[in-house]
Amino acid sequence: AGTGDYSEEDADDTEDISGKYLCPGFIDGHIHIESSMLLPAEFARAALPHGTTAVVADPHEIANVCGSRGIEFMLEASEGLPLTMYFMIPSCVPSTEFDEAGACLEAEDIRPFYDHPRVLGLGEVMSYHAAAAGDRKLREKIDDAEKRGLAVNGHAPLLSGRMLDRYIAAGVGDDHECSSAEEAMERIRKGQRVMIRQGTAARNLKELLPLFEEPFAGRCLLV
């Protein structure tokens, strides 16, 4: 796509958009489709009219109930939709070692999913104490993602100081749990990206408005 003089011979396909507006679609960088209580196709139908053309989903809710079969279902059910659905593979199933879940996914269970073209990395590392402590099983999951050059999402509300240093050093590249500008700025200064969340359960946009100024803006995403 471009502006200027082009000939139809240069294009595989052309469309006359005279009198229309053209703008890029929104990409939601962190979402749990299951929380909407909709199947992927119905979620796409609801989100597209509002300008969202792609999402990066973490299916840890269905994975905590159905295990690998739940992840497989989400990948299959999102195939060929007009809204592109990328996925992060859940890192914490169960969410914590104290939980009783419908499944337990180890590194060898999630490793095959990294070969899928719409899988972008490892989902939010909620067990931040395990990450900071160098837990062997979690370390193996993070290493698998890093070896493939894939992203590792974070989830560490109110974590600060040396504990945050250890969490970031474990390989966690971002966080969407910041509820104050000070909390978010510490993460950015220490190398993470911050997802500014304005969702159904948590609305942090107002508190994080200072991040829209340089030098912080380039390290932020809206989700």
Language-model features and meaning:
Residues 1-25:
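Histidine-rich, glycine-flanked metal-binding segment
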